[in-house]
Amino acid sequence: GLGDVYKRQIDHYGGKDTRVFREVTETGEALLDLAQIAGSTTKAQAAILHDCESRWAMEDAQGPRNMGLQYMNTVKKVYGGLRKLGVNVDFLDMEENLSDYRIVFAPMLYLFRAGIEEKIRKFVADGGTFVMTYWSGVVDENDLCFLGGTPHGLMDVFGLRSTELDALYDQDVNAGVGEGKTYEIRNFCDLVKTNGAETLLAYRDDFYAGYPALTKNVFGEGEAYYVCADFEQAFYLSLIHI
């Protein structure tokens, strides 16, 4: 048919004085100029810890919200914030190496596998930036609660201790405020007691108005941020700029 007549040639004329010939030639020259990047890769500078066993443990916990833990939405907000800023992202589980990255996010890392706290500690001490959210480091790999405070094994790294987690009704809204900025909060509000961490944002409403909603702690050569609440997407765009 007609497809066989036209599909495999530049044209039927055979000369060099046509627009199509010139454009095909220019395309070939451009591809030669790009030969040096053939096979090259772009190394991600950021990573997100996303662990299926931790998610399963959260879903099996039957709380603190019986409906709507919003775990995957939280992961998507972190990822979306990074990608909107043009940052390449790798997804890791807790068995993988962190040292290849400049910044690592751990959204709702409820379950800590053995050794992850030491891995995070070393990453921050060696100069990395680690961002952890509320409801992290609560149970071990056997789904048994840690004793002594959360986030388990990292309270000195983050310069704080989580004291309680408030679960909001669907219609409830709080906010994190600071430095002239306000970010909407829904679903979860972690109440923390700081021990060296700097408060960057504070809760606006409820009995914990003024409590930290976002903190930063310098540990070794690096920095550890603790996101105390379920913030809106715009918060993560701002956080990555901090």
Describe the function of each predicted region.
Residues G1-H241:
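Carbohydrate-binding surfaces of carbohydrate-active enzymes
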